[in-house]
């Protein structure tokens, strides 16, 4: 399956979809809108790839700005290459087919060698969920595991 994903990258136009964040904070990561460009950047930088597949309905879409709303997450996101795909476009439809995902929005983490999908969910991620995902997969190691259905103990 993943071999087909790599094969399809050759079909996608890598010259489209690099969207740099023009913000005051220089420490924010580059945000890609083209999967092929993000894939190549992650491969070159040896960083895990955080893929967000968004639906056409913006009200249910994952908003990267909201994910970045804490310093902890901004710091963690620097360890990833982030790509946000609008699945209502031709490019987005193609990428969504590669992931074979019917439930949107969808979040996936690809390892730092771009060979394995380490994590995937269509669950609506809240603040602590994002913290756990980003902390667990920040090194892009294939041995990392996370089950968001397991609640962490709260010591009082």
Go through each PLM region and give its residues.
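Structural alpha/beta surface segment adjacent to cysteine/selenocysteine redox centers
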Residues: 94-102
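Non-catalytic, surface beta->alpha helical segment in thiol-disulfide oxidoreductase systems
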Residues: 67-68, 102-146
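Thiol-based oxidoreductase modules, predominantly thioredoxin-like and allied folds used
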Residues: 26-33, 53-56, 73-92
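N-terminal leader/targeting and pre-domain segments
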Residues: 7-9, 13-45, 129-132, 136-155
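Positively charged n-region of N-terminal signal peptides that target proteins for export
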Residues: 1-4
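Short active-site neighborhood of thiol/selenol oxidoreductases, capturing the structured segment around
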Residues: 45-59
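Solvent-exposed loop/turn segments at secondary-structure junctions
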Residues: 56-59, 87-91, 114-116, 124-127
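Typically the conserved alpha-helix immediately C-terminal to a functionally engaged Cys/Sec
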Residues: 35, 60-76
């Amino acid at each position: 399956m993943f071999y087909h994903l790599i094969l399809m990258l050759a079909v996608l136009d890598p010259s489209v979809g690099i969207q740099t964040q023009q913000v005051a904070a220089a420490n924010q990561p580059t945000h890609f809108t083209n999967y092929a460009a993000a894939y190549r950047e992650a491969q070159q930088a040896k960083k895990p790839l955080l893929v967000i597949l968004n639906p056409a309905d913006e009200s249910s879409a994952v908003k990267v700005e909201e994910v970045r709303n804490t310093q902890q997450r901004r710091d963690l996101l620097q360890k990833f290459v982030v790509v946000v795909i609008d699945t209502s476009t031709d490019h987005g439809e193609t990428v969504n087919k590669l992931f074979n995902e019917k439930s949107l929005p969808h979040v996936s983490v690809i390892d730092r060698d771009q060979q394995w999908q380490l994590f995937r969910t269509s669950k609506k991620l809240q603040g602590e969920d994002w913290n756990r995902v980003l902390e667990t997969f920040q090194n892009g190691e294939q041995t990392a595991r996370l089950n968001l259905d397991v609640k962490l103990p709260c010591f009082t």
